[in-house]
């Protein structure tokens, strides 16, 4: 492999290689990216002062996580999302406790609305809205969080014979091996879900495969977590996926309003649910909404992985 460095170029030989080049924030076109008041998620972590008002474009996990942070720090937060619901990909009932809570705390949440353009003014950025919410509003800062794009097409992987899709992803098998037998890929560059803990496990699988171990990766047992307030987490098959595949499934729910600890913490808005296959009674998925859902979902991952029967859980 050839490496271009500041001082010189260097060639490195290897028996096996792992590509872990990640992804970058997706930038909307026709936006004034030269203005530092327009940010991506990386910029939002480097602010030296808290903005009085913040517009978050994108109601996905990253956008909502940053919205929760800055709302807690005192910003008047507005979220705009193009689709009919927040956090696409999660089951709507899991998102509902979060949406009810932030609706009381944020300045506004605009669904089925898009930002058509952003004008630069001396004292603010002016966002123009189209859709269910029309008009224009001023904000001290605007965060664009509409997704991420993989970096697979930025490293000349094709020169080594590695397949890269038109979207920049690098396809792999369940050992994280690319179409070139001694080159592996992990993390955001191999596809969804784009989660750090997924990438860590993929790295373990790839390293074991390099060492000749019989290791394999199954994305279905990797939990997805939104570190919002309340947190939202799920693992395995979602209800939307079960419906789409025509699976005959059942749902068991436990409302946290019936939990003494939740009552003591005055956080009863959450719930836990399990999905099971009605034919086999085996658990195929789980979801949790509420404080510390990201920790609690770890209890559900082995249940989903081992396909315990519904009556075997308590």
Q: What are these model-predicted stretches?
A:
Residues 1, 73-174, 237, 244, ...:
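A Rossmann-like FAD-binding core segment of flavoenzymes
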Residues 1-18:
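Conserved redox-cofactor binding core of oxidoreductases
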Residues 13-22, 140-147:
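Short hydrophobic core segments
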Residues 21-75, 80, 105-109, 158-160, ...:
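Glycine-rich dinucleotide-binding loop and its adjacent helix/turn
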Residues 27-29, 65, 70, 151-154, ...:
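Glycine/Thr-rich phosphate-binding loops of Rossmann-like dinucleotide-binding domains
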Residues 34-51, 137-210:
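FAD-site-proximal beta/loop scaffold in flavoenzymes
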Residues 91-93, 104, 115-116, 148-151, ...:
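Mid-to-C-terminal Rossmann-like scaffold of FAD/NAD(P)H-dependent oxidoreductases
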Residues 307-314:
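Single conserved hydrophobic/aromatic residue that forms the stacking wall/gate
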């Amino acid at each position: 492999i050839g490496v271009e460095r500041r001082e010189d170029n260097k060639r490195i030989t290897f028996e096996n290689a792992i590509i872990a080049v990640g992804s970058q924030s997706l930038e909307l076109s026709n936006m004034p990216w030269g203005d530092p008041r327009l940010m991506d998620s990386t910029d939002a972590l480097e602010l030296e002062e808290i903005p009085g008002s913040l517009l978050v474009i994108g109601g996905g996990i990253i956008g909502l996580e940053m919205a929760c942070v800055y709302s807690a720090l005192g910003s008047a937060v507005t979220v705009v999302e193009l689709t009919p619901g927040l956090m696409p990909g999660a089951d709507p009932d899991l998102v509902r406790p979060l949406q009810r809570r932030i609706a009381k705390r944020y300045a506004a949440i605009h669904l089925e609305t898009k930002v058509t353009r952003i004008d630069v003014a001396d004292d603010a950025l002016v966002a123009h809205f189209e859709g269910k919410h029309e008009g224009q509003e001023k904000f001290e800062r605007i965060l664009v969080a509409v997704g991420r794009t993989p970096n697979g097409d930025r490293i000349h992987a094709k020169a080594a014979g590695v397949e890269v899709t038109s979207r920049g992803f690098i396809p792999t098998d369940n050992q994280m091996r690319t179409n070139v037998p001694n080159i592996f890929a992990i993390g955001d560059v191999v596809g969804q879900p784009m989660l750090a803990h997924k990438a860590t496990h993929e790295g373990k699988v790839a390293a074991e495969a390099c060492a000749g171990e019989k290791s394999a990766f199954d994305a279905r047992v990797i939990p997805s977590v939104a570190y919002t307030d309340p947190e939202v987490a799920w693992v395995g098959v979602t209800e939307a996926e079960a419906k789409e595949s025509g699976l005959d499934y059942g749902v068991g729910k436990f409302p946290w309003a019936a939990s003494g600890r939740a009552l003591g913490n005055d956080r009863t808005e959450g719930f836990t649910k399990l999905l099971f296959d009605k034919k086999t009674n085996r658990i195929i998925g789980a979801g949790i909404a509420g404080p510390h859902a990201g920790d609690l979902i770890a209890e559900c991952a082995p249940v989903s992985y081992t396909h315990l029967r519904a009556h075997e859980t308590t």
